[in-house]
Regions:
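Conserved helicase/translocase motor-coupling segment
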Residues: 29-99
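Short hydrophobic segments within beta-strands
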Residues: 30-32, 118, 205, 250
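Conserved interdomain linker/interface between the two RecA-like ATPase lobes of SF2 helicase motors
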Residues: 1-43
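Long, charge-rich boundary regions
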Residues: 72-162
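Hydrophobic/aromatic residues located in beta-strands of well-ordered beta-sheets
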Residues: 27, 115, 202-203
Length: 335
């Protein structure tokens, strides 16, 4: 189902939820963001507050007191909710994105429906799943039928508690990750849910209904997806048609980071030319998250059909481990 750009819920979502609530059916909504909102943005200058230790937006949680607390999901540092912009001083602060808490809030406002939020940590073991099943059974015995909001799919479905409607709220969010395997991960995220969780009805809300990973997952076209994905990977020398190695360096001093990575890049290009390994692509790029726990990060990507042979030469000529580089010789992702 297509969601309009300025809408949180599509028309089909609203009709589906209303229909199943009236019928007393069990609804499961999957949203992969915790908390209340993804972050805040200044409408005067566009500034988005980031964690001081990590280059990610500060997420906000709604406390029982009604106040909001900022939290970095990586280092867990806490922040106060901004009243004015730290960059320009404007008070035009707006929130963006939606987490589990805001979804529960909107469902209550729009449908007068109660929700039960289940975080991913709640279902990491069979014992915790059994505890959750008991909680759901207790709600049922009290004639309560809340909408269940999950932050992750269960690898082992709850056999005793069958849902009538499963909704993927942001089915295309994984496609925003700049990685060669983003399409495959997005496909399997949907496909495996359709296979494992025997819901009578699924709703997939997306801004990209024609994207092949979403379209083919909804139609259960696994072989067709593989054909398209294999063609893409073969054309760009991505695994399994090419090899991929990442060499990561991190430092608290940004200048030192750039100097080290630039020097390594030049040394690798020199070795490539010296040993005439032409079927290689060597370039530098920052990871998806540039700074983590106060350290800046940068990496050298080596891609092609002769990566392993080249890395054997690199190890014999350069003392990378002693210089603080972290090497992933069989990388499955570039972020």
């Amino acid at each position: 189902m297509l969601r309009e750009e300025n809408q949180i819920f599509s028309e089909l979502f609203e009709k589906g939820v209303e229909k199943y609530l009236r019928a007393g059916k069990k609804i499961w909504i999957l949203i992969n963001k915790k908390g209340h909102t993804w972050g805040t943005i200044c409408h005067s200058c566009g500034h988005i507050p980031q964690c001081e230790n990590c280059s990610v937006a500060i997420n906000y949680y709604l406390l029982p007191s009604g106040q909001k607390m900022g939290l970095c999901h990586i280092c867990k540092r806490q922040y106060l909710y901004p009243q004015t912009c730290a960059q320009c001083g404007s008070s035009k602060i707006k929130e963006f994105g939606m987490g589990t808490q805001k979804l529960a809030q909107l469902l209550k406002e729009r449908f007068w429906a109660e929700s039960l939020i289940v975080e991913s940590e709640t279902v990491r073991s069979q014992k915790k799943i059994e505890k959750l099943t008991l909680e759901l059974d207790n709600l049922k015995s009290q004639s309560k039928n809340p909408i269940i909001i999950w932050t992750s799919l269960l690898t082992t479905p709850i056999k005793k508690w069958k849902f009538d409607l499963l909704i993927f709220l942001n089915a295309d969010i994984g496609l925003n990750i700049p990685d060669f395997n983003a399409n495959e991960k997005n496909f399997y995220f949907l496909y495996e849910a359709f296979v494992k969780h025997q819901c009578p009805t699924f709703l997939v809300q997306t801004m990209n209904p024609e994207h092949y990973s979403i379209r083919m997952a909804c139609k259960m076209q696994k072989s067709d997806f593989y054909a398209v994905e294999n063609e893409f990977r073969q054309a760009h020398n991505y695994p399994p048609y090419g090899e991929l190695c990442l060499i990561l360096y991190k430092d608290e001093i940004e200048e030192k980071l750039f100097t080290k990575v630039d020097q390594l890049h030049k040394e690798l290009l020199y070795l490539q030319e010296k040993y005439q390994l032409k079927d290689l692509e060597i370039y530098t790029t920052p990871p998806l998250i540039y700074k983590i726990f106060g350290k800046y990060r940068y990496q050298v990507v080596i891609k092609g059909k002769e990566v392993r042979n080249f890395m054997d030469i690199v190890f014999s000529k350069l003392q990378l481990h002693k210089k603080g580089f972290k090497i992933n010789r069989d990388a499955e992702s570039i972020v």
